[in-house]
């Protein structure tokens, strides 16, 4: 005897009009196959990520800032598939190629080329598919001779005068790493044009929050953000907008680091 089981959807949640419109703006004319294979999931996710989160009172960000944070977060959590899908959407929302490339370059100092290489390749592919001529105009502002000095100045500008001699501090066997932080991390990347210090600190915050396991550095860069004008409320908005892409544990860890940094800066 043939038994036929009918699968009945018990709790239907229609996708909101705002979510539909936002999705259409991100992916014009595209209909996800997940609507067929995973309808319950996609209804809940789309309504949350593309309506509830975006429209949460007091937690919104300008489009450019929001997309910078999301792309940096996806690089940090190694979400290459989602990054490739959303990069075009970020451009449709107005994020310029120079800023996109600078986010990717900035990531190398915090994630290493081993994790950033796929994102650099994907970025180049998407940009060229959209008619962007590569290479873009150069943004480097330092030379071999002055990168350490300029990097140190960037550290001082962001974190304060206490960083002036950091490059020559530390135990003899490892002080070269502090030197590299000055000449490479800050001298080669932070000194570039294309992103402001505030934008670089925000993207760095997103890299660290998304990769997890580096809370001391995340707390330090939360403090750096506050020093360059990205206050506690702003960082909470960044965490909120990126939460759908990294989940609750890392978002809550990031929030704890922001609270710790804000308390320290208030003393």
Give residue ranges: language-model regions.
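Acidic, glycine/proline-rich low-complexity segments that act as flexible tails and inter-domain linkers
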Residues: 8-64, 84, 116-197, 227, ...
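A ubiquitous short alpha-helical element
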Residues: 29-34, 67-74, 166, 204-208, ...
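Short, structured motif recognition centered on aromatic/hydrophobic residues
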Residues: 65-74, 100-104, 199-209, 218, ...
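Extended intrinsically disordered, low-complexity coil regions enriched in Ser, Thr, Gly, Ala
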Residues: 78-101, 115-128, 212-237, 249-262
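C-terminal binding/interaction regions
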Residues: 107-108, 232, 242, 246
